[in-house]
């Protein structure tokens, strides 16, 4: 191989190293974004995408557990009884939910899809603790709501007092679990209300989940982004019932945003907050990162509802807009009256978990526990896919005395717990295995980036270093052959030999003024190489380099 060929090969190695370093730096800065774009093209929701069927009809079994609070001492509910309302929890009453998306319409102009959610609920007797025929006593919310509306007018108050006696209304009502939940029950005040003001009473019956079973209107019309133009927007709500602001709460509290629960933004971090939109609350619930967990071997970030999620300005100023009509309750409950025909209904975490202690102090029978009552979502951070979801919310009724209404003039002010629901879904091991590929691909990209950077550094730095090392350890004749031709190009050979002479000088001067024995190489044009040995005084050393000779003499 000629010297020119060797030179070109060496130059090629260095250039290859530079290219590897540049590629490694580019991947280091852009790999996550590149992978997100590639995955977005594959995962964006469309009629032909892989995610469509799983989104339309969930492939996972969905357990919907309902717990009811049975009021055991309603006869002692009056001012001066010195007895707190006592409740016992009944359930769970488990239902298997079969959800479906219907009335699907695609909107390519803004990469969104509109749909209605339709769910069927089937009672699971084997998984339940009780039957649908169990009796439960709870607050008569319809009668109290009618009394609240009539409180400002004397004629209305008189009419409500007469109706309460005529229809034998009490502070509480007792029904079967089936009637309380999906079947519903008839109430005389609802029948009268439909005759007087039908626009305010859209239903014939009342029940906690009536008429949710088999209804496509219960959650309203939902429009969400598909992620076709931006994968980070996939699954995020755009409008609810054609609204971007519900009007239920002022300012940002009434904005429509967040996820419906199927998709969340990718590339999540521990500082992020995710939002889940709750149609029946007319608001989004913030979930904050709490810990890193493992689900079927896949690392996931657990986001949970904190005190911030159920505050109304008591603890966090930014949540003050959840106060309705200037009335702010102690932290821990959410007023959903604007979403529930202005009923005095409040939502909280089960058993008033993370709520102000005053709610628990006013009643008996409830005991909040994080393991049982936490609302959480474990999300795979790279893809934003839910791995494990659990928890729910509790419905409460705010009971207060109403002057002029005989039935409610002497009742204490108490937040009455009625029921709470828990949805639990966890991905199967097969689905988890597919999801596990996402972090592996991300890791693979990082490994390739490291290999490119390391290989580039080796090619760029190792070869020149090897050449210098080889030169320093070569024999004197080889060094002379390298240095001598420099004169032909007008280069002062003394400058070229200076590093070698400096090396000799350093080796000698390291002994101070002591007499040292050294073996010196004297380069000579005629003889080629001459070895001189001697002993000399280091303080009298001097290097002489002839202008017409590359000989180095040390004396």
Curated annotation (Swiss-Prot):
Keywords: Cell membrane, Glycoprotein, Membrane, Transmembrane, Transmembrane helix. It comes from the Eukaryota. Glycans are attached at residues 70, 110, 129, 213, 242, 312, 342. Its main location: membrane. The keyword rRNA processing does not apply. The name 'peste' means plague in Latin and derives from its role in bacterial infection. PANTHER family: GH07959P-RELATED (PTHR11923:SF93), SCAVENGER RECEPTOR CLASS B TYPE-1 SR-B1 (PTHR11923). This is Protein peste. The lineage of its organism: Eukaryota, Metazoa, Ecdysozoa, Arthropoda, Hexapoda.
């Amino acid at each position: 191989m000629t010297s020119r060929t060797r030179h070109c090969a060496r130059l090629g190695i260095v250039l290859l190293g530079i290219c590897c370093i540049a590629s490694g730096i580019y991947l280091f800065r852009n790999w996550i974004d590149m992978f997100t774009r590639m995955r977005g093209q594959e995962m964006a929701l469309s009629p032909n995408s892989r995610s469509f069927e799983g989104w339309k009809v969930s492939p996972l079994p969905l357990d919907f557990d309902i717990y009811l609070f049975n009021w055991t001492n309603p006869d002692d509910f009056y001012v001066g009884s010195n007895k707190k309302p006592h409740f016992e929890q009944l359930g769970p009453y488990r239902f298997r939910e079969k959800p479906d998306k219907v009335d699907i319409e695609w909107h390519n102009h803004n990469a969104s899809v509109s749909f209605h959610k339709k769910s069927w609920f089937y009672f699971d007797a084997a998984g339940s603790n009780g039957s649908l025929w169990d009796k439960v006593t709870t607050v008569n919310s319809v009668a109290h709501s009618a009394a609240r509306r009539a409180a400002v007018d004397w004629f209305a108050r008189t009419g409500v007092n007469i109706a309460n006696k005529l229809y034998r209304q009490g502070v509480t009502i007792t029904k079967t679990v089936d009637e309380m939940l999906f079947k519903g029950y008839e109430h005389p005040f609802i029948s009268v209300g439909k005759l007087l003001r039908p626009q305010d009473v859209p239903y014939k019956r009342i029940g906690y989940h009536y008429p949710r079973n088999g209804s496509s209107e219960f959650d309203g019309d939902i429009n969400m982004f598909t992620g076709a133009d931006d994968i980070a927007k996939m699954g995020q709500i755009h409008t609810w019932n054609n609204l971007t602001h519900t009007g239920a709460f002022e300012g940002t509290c009434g904005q429509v945003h967040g996820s419906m629960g199927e998709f969340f933004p990718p590339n999540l971090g521990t500082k992020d907050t995710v939002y889940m939109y709750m149609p029946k609350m007319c608001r989004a619930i913030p979930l904050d990162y709490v810990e890193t967990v493992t689900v079927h071997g896949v690392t996931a970030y657990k986001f949970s509802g904190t005190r911030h999620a159920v505050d109304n300005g008591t603890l966090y100023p930014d949540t003050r807009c959840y106060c309705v009509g200037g009335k702010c309750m102690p932290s821990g409950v959410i007023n959903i009256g604007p979403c529930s025909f202005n009923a005095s209904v409040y939502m909280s975490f089960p058993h008033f978990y993370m709520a102000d202690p005053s709610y628990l102090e006013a009643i008996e029978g409830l005991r909040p526990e994080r393991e049982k009552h936490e609302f959480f979502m474990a999300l795979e951070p790279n893809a934003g896919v839910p791995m494990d979801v659990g928890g729910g919310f509790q419905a409460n009724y705010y009971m207060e005395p109403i002057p002029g209404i005989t039935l409610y003039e002497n009742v204490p002010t108490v937040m009455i717990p009625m029921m709470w629901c828990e949805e639990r879904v966890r991905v199967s091991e097969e689905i988890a295995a597919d999801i596990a590929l996402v972090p592996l691909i991300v890791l693979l990209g990082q490994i390739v980036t490291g290999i490119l950077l390391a290989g580039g550094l080796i090619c760029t730095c190792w070869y020149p270093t090897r050449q210098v090392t080889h030169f320093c350890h070569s024999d004197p004749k080889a060094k002379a052959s390298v240095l001598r031709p420099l004169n032909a190009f007008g280069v002062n050979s003394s400058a070229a030999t200076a590093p070698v002479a400096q090396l000799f000088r350093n080796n000698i001067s390291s002994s101070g003024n002591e007499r040292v024995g050294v073996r010196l190489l004297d380069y000579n044009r005629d003889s080629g190489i001459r070895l001189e040995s001697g002993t000399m005084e280091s303080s009298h050393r001097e290097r002489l380099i002839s202008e017409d000779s590359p000989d180095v003499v040390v004396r």
